[in-house]
């Protein structure tokens, strides 16, 4: 039987002492077994690093790296991506979790459709692991033009071919660095396929970046005009679609 390709799970870590164990546990429980977990601590001021090191002592598949200075999430993810040895790279934030069959389903998607990016639907949980709001259900296909109207790929749901991601890292100059990356990959011909079942859960914590929407709209407009070089008309169309989707996703 052909050996399953290695998947590298890249997890940036910053002050997530309450959730890092649950995030790692959701990876260790995956039905897909050929994994390495790369945790990169970005100068946490709580016990996050201590917990990560304790987890690594118990499992040889866990690698813990530490930044000498606080680098921010984009550069921290990039460091993990560069260290990854797998044929595929999955991204997971240290306060989010996966369902047990997430990676197995996504590897099959990539292989069956000869695609480079897999994504999935996701739910929302609070600090106590309780579901909040309706899950975000994604379509089975997306492309550059569709992503202008509705962004359906996100970090903790994505599985990407490693060689593609290593050649196209996150740009730390943008607030929505993940959206910039997906759009550039799709614009350059990458194929993305989705699983509309809920395979991941985003944790919304008061005061966290994911729950802070200030200035997000301004940054998204900047991406349309300065990064993607869209016309004014197309930028307005994309921005209105983005605003409507954001309201629906986070408030209903």
Q: Can you describe what each PLM-predicted range is?
A:
Residues 82, 135-215, 223:
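Conserved nucleotide-sugar donor-binding catalytic segment
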Residues 41-50, 69-71, 93:
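A conserved acidic beta->alpha catalytic loop
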Residues 4-7, 28-39, 47, 59-63:
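Short loop->beta transition adjacent to catalytic acidic/histidine clusters or analogous donor-positioning motifs
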Residues 67-84, 105:
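Glycine-rich, basic loop-to-helix element that forms the pyrophosphate-binding segment
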């Amino acid at each position: 039987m052909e050996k399953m390709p290695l998947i590298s799970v890249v997890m940036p870590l910053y002050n997530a002492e309450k959730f890092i164990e649950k995030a790692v546990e959701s990876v260790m429980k995956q039905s897909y077994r050929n994994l390495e977990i790369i945790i990169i601590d970005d100068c946490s001021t709580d016990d996050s690093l201590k917990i990560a090191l304790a987890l690594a002592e118990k499992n040889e598949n866990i690698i813990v790296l530490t930044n000498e200075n606080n680098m921010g999430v984009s550069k921290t993810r990039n460091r993990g991506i560069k260290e990854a040895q797998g044929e595929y790279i999955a991204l997971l934030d240290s306060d989010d979790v996966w369902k047990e069959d997430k990676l197995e389903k996504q590897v099959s998607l990539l292989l069956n459709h000869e695609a480079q990016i897999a994504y999935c639907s996701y739910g929302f949980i609070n600090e106590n692991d309780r579901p909040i709001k309706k899950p975000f259900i994604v379509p089975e296909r997306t492309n550059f033009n569709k992503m202008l109207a509705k962004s359906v790929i996100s970090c903790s749901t994505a599985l990407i071919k490693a060689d593609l991601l290593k050649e196209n890292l996150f740009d730390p100059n943008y607030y929505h660095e993940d959206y910039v990356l997906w759009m550039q990959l799709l614009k350059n011909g990458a194929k993305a396929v989705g699983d509309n079942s809920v395979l991941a859960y985003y944790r919304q914590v008061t005061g966290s970046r994911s729950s802070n929407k200030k200035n997000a709209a301004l940054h998204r407009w900047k991406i349309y005009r300065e990064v993607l070089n869209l016309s004014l008309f197309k930028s307005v169309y994309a921005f209105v679609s983005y605003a409507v989707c954001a309201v629906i996703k986070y408030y209903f």
